[in-house]
Amino acid sequence: PSDRIGQPYIQVDPKKIVGIVETNWPDEARGFADADPLTDKIGQNVADFLAADMKRGIIPSTFLPLQSGVGNIANAVLGALGRDKTIPAFEMYTGLIRDGRVKFGSACSLTVTNDCLQGIYDDMDFFRDKLVLRPSEISNNPEVVRRLGVISINTAIEADLYGNVNSTHIGGTKMMNGIGGSGDFTRNAYIS
């Protein structure tokens, strides 16, 4: 997931530039509420489940790249995985990187809070070889996801006896989570 190709800049023909607008207006993203005991417990349960699967040999002892959605539960899972001494350092390969996973990632979109973005700017030398942004045609490509052996984690609202999962709607009409690229990862992951 951390392999790199290309250049760390975009080459543009100067004749095609019509104007440059300088601004110090920061990018903004919606933050998430602080973790509560319930989200912490969910995160710990998922981390314990993955650690047990690794101990049984279902997941390799080197672990696998992780794909995760966004939100309080995803942040709680990643926090619990980070604290678990039995799980080695791992890479992220996901469609969207948020604050909770910015220190290790590969994605097609970087959406972080203002404080996190400023932290990236302030420590660019550290992050330069840690973050890789790719077009979604690559990051969500089923063949790439399958080849990497990604562990896909997404929040499910409900599941039926046949394994069908509703991860978007409550009561049929209220949308709770966006679908995004989760389907690409879920169908092609090593474990989902």
PLM region spans:
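Metallocofactor- and cofactor-centric catalytic cores in central/energy metabolism, strongly enriched
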Residues: P1-P135, L148, A156-V165, G171-G178, ...
